[in-house]
Amino acid sequence: NTFINLTEDLSGGVKLELYDPFLPSSCIIDRFPVKDVNIPTNEFMVKILDAIDAYLEVGHVPYIHCWGGIGRTGTAVGCWLIRHGHATPATVIDLLDELRLGDIEAGYRPSPETPYQLEFILDWELGK
């Protein structure tokens, strides 16, 4: 019932059809625009992770997405997993791969998408 939208520009994302009008009014869309195939600053990632944690704390189910669900999404989810001790820098990529097995269209593609995104996740720390 909560969308964490990491796309830029349009509320539904560039080249992504607007979904806002089709959602029930009870849904929340929280935007944290990150340029495609890029990484946020550490401070901006902390804001993204804090929002995810705040929604989880009140019982919401956050759906984190970017345009393809691989680069920016994988970066945010990877950092969240490390933040909470569900993974370490040594195990996070294997866990992301495992979590993406159900993605029929893109599950075969590595996440995150770029070397910069991978380095960003691997530098993330527990509790950050």
Where are these regions (language model features)?
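Cysteine-based protein phosphatase catalytic domain of the PTP/DSP
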Residues: 1-62, 84-115
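Short, flexible helix/strand-to-coil boundary loops that buttress conserved ligand/catalytic motifs
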Residues: 7, 77, 125
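A phosphate-binding catalytic loop at a beta-strand-loop-alpha-helix junction
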Residues: 59-78
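Generic alpha-helical structural context detector
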Residues: 78, 94, 122-123
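Walker A/P-loop NTP-binding motif
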Residues: 78-84
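C-terminal domain-closing interface element
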Residues: 119-128
